[in-house]
């Protein structure tokens, strides 16, 4: 997969995706979640996250307290040490990574803390969740990060 080309295409489709989000909010189809879930399954049959890892390279997940506790145990350090070394509070008051790419991302695009990764990483790109209508703004933003999300939105149009 040509990740830069896919993301460039998504950037050019931004206006069309905004119109789609507006239309879905104004007239949400009853089967919106089902449609997203079907397109999610289809996209990830073809797209291998390990060939991309753009989410890990460019964005930070939100770390909840439970994520911090789980990851600190996995790394054999105190939660306060994990926060001090890897995290900071963002403008919304959420813990996020200090740096991008993620310090736990290997050169082979594998996550060195995969079993202990935050919930936000486990659920990304969030296109198989319930109540997709409630996260359309997030989904729109994710079209510029994840080629699979861009493809899902393109197919929804």
Segments (PLM) and residue ranges:
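Short loop/turn segments that flank or connect secondary-structure elements
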Residues: 1-157
């Amino acid at each position: 997969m040509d990740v830069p080309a896919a993301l460039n295409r998504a950037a050019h489709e931004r206006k069309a995706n905004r119109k789609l989000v507006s239309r879905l909010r104004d007239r949400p189809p009853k089967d919106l979640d089902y449609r997203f879930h079907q397109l999610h399954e289809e996209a990830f049959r073809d797209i291998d996250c390990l060939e991309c890892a753009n989410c890990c390279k460019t964005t930070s997940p939100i770390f909840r307290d439970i994520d911090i506790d789980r990851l600190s145990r996995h790394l054999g350090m105190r939660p306060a040490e994990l926060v001090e070394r890897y995290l900071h509070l963002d403008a919304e008051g959420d813990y996020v990574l200090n740096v991008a790419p993620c310090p736990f991302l290997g050169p082979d695009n594998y996550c060195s803390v995969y079993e202990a990764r935050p919930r936000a990483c486990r659920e990304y790109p969030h296109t198989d969740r319930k109540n997709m209508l409630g996260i359309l703004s997030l989904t729109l933003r994710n079209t510029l990060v994840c080629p699979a999300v861009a493809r899902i939105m393109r197919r929804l149009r």
